[in-house]
Regions:
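Conserved nucleotide- and phosphate/pyrophosphate-binding catalytic cores
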Residues: 80-246
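Divalent-metal (Mg2+/Mn2+/Ca2+)-assisted nucleotide/phosphate chemistry catalytic cores
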Residues: 1-115
Length: 249
């Protein structure tokens, strides 16, 4: 647990002396988040510093590879810059991490359910791992699609259509055989939607089946942990102790 590892706060403080305000202002992810949260007029220092805090999270435990989405690439580059600057002053102490992007390009930057921005808790456009089956279905059935696709007979657009973006990310050949056997693959589904004659409700129901299958085992495991909260705290305690030791090395 981050709050139980004081070394992370210490590293953040040390690193803050290696990064300029102007460099943080140029970080594309920071700029986007400032705009998203309407912080232009008054930026909290803690928020502005979070790329440095993230660098501490990564380097304290000598991470060599960091799995990220496309929008986090500037953050990792910021970390790499801090590592290079630190090592140039204090010898080769820190590990410069590489990034690991999803092989499926559609997974690199999933939009929120509203289709306008990335998933954000503050915007309420997220599907959470903790969501119930009903919550997930409600969010999927209200997903942004194609505003010009008013009638089922109307030709539709798959580009910029949030449902198809999620299908690109999560659908597999077996899903069609199980849930939508009249189509051999996703391309056939896209072609039909583009021609017209395929309604949004049908593709949303298909996506819901896929997402429920994906989230069901996660939901079940979470339910098991919820039955023994003291055990969860013990896992967090032991994990924090282990990482404190690793951060000291």
């Amino acid at each position: 647990m981050q709050s139980q590892i004081p070394e992370l706060t210490e590293l953040t403080f040390f690193y803050s002396n290696l990064v300029t305000v102007s460099r943080l202002q140029r970080n594309p992810t920071v700029k986007n988040e400032i705009k998203l949260r309407n912080f232009e007029a008054s930026i909290p220092v803690g928020f502005f510093n979070y790329p440095i805090s993230q660098a501490a999270d990564i380097t304290a435990f000598k991470a060599t590879t960091v799995p990220v989405g496309e929008d986090q690439l500037p953050m990792i580059e910021q970390t790499r810059e801090i590592v290079r600057k630190f090592n140039s002053i204090y010898d080769e102490v820190l590990v410069e991490p590489d990034v690991l992007l999803p092989e499926n390009e559609a997974c690199c930057r999933l939009p929120g359910t509203d289709g306008g921005q990335k998933m954000s808790k503050s915007l309420g456009n997220c599907i959470y791992l903790a969501d119930t089956e009903a919550d997930v279905k409600k969010k999927i059935m209200s997903m942004y699609t194609d505003p010009t696709h008013i009638q089922i007979s109307d030709p539709g657009h798959v580009e910029g259509n949030t449902v198809f973006t999620y299908l690109d990310a999560f659908s597999k050949p077996g899903h069609f055989e199980e849930y939508l056997p009249e189509y051999a693959n996703l391309q056939e589904l896209k072609d039909h939607y583009t021609r017209g004659g395929l309604g949004d409700v049908k593709i949303k129901k298909f996506l819901n089946n896929i997402m429920q299958e994906e989230l069901s085992p996660i939901r079940a495991r979470r339910a098991e942990y919820e039955k023994d909260i003291p055990a969860v705290y013990e896992i967090l305690r032991k994990g924090s102790e282990t990482e404190i030791g690793r951060a000291h090395v």
